[in-house]
């Protein structure tokens, strides 16, 4: 009697560094759209596919993004883990967009309009972005024109 009901534990799906590295097959650094097979599902990215990379190299312009698989539960947050091979800068805004988002293709900063979650880097090597309810698949991107380098990504439900 008087015990609190047990809270359901959160579930996390990960795009691992090993899965990212296995998708790095190109001999150049050009940015292209491709898929990454993962135990958590198929991720779609517009990023460099250079086999020189041991991380996911993305950019916040000209169509750059990471798109999660479509999950069967609402996403509560996305945590991006930056590679220790590159510096992480403070004050860069990252947004999560719904699956209906139209990815900008211009060579300019992305607008934040229509985001379902955002967070700003503080220089640490991970950033958790809370996601509004009702999203089972999302895009993740930096708002500035900078490139960013990810070791792995966690999606929590």
Question: Where do the language-model regions lie?
Answer:
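Short beta-strand-plus-loop segments that form exposed binding edges in beta-rich domains
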Residues: 139-149
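Extended extracellular/luminal ectodomain segments enriched in beta-structured repeat modules
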Residues: 70-79, 135-137
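Extended, low-complexity, turn-rich repeat/linker tracts enriched in Gly/Pro/Ser/Thr and Asp/Glu
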Residues: 61, 81-93, 146-147
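Extracellular beta-strand elements of beta-rich domains used
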Residues: 153-155
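Short, surface-exposed beta-strand/strand-loop-strand elements in extracellular ectodomains
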Residues: 86-109
């Amino acid at each position: 009697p008087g015990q609190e009901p047990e809270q359901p534990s959160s579930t996390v799906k990960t795009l691992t560094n090993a899965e990212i590295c296995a998708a790095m097959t190109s001999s150049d650094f050009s940015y292209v759209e491709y898929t990454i097979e993962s135990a958590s599902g198929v991720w779609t990215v517009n990023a460099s596919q250079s086999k020189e990379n041991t991380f996911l190299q993305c950019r916040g312009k000209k169509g750059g993004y990471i798109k999660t698989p479509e999950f069967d539960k609402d996403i509560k947050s996305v945590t991006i883990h930056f590679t220790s091979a590159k510096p992480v800068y403070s004050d860069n805004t990252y947004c999560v967009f719904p699956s209906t988002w139209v990815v900008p293709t211009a060579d300019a900063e992305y607008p934040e309009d229509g985001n379902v979650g955002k967070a700003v880097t503080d220089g640490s090597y991970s950033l958790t972005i809370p996601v509004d309810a009702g999203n089972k698949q999302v895009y993740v991107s930096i708002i500035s024109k900078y490139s960013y380098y990810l070791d792995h990504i966690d999606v929590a439900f």
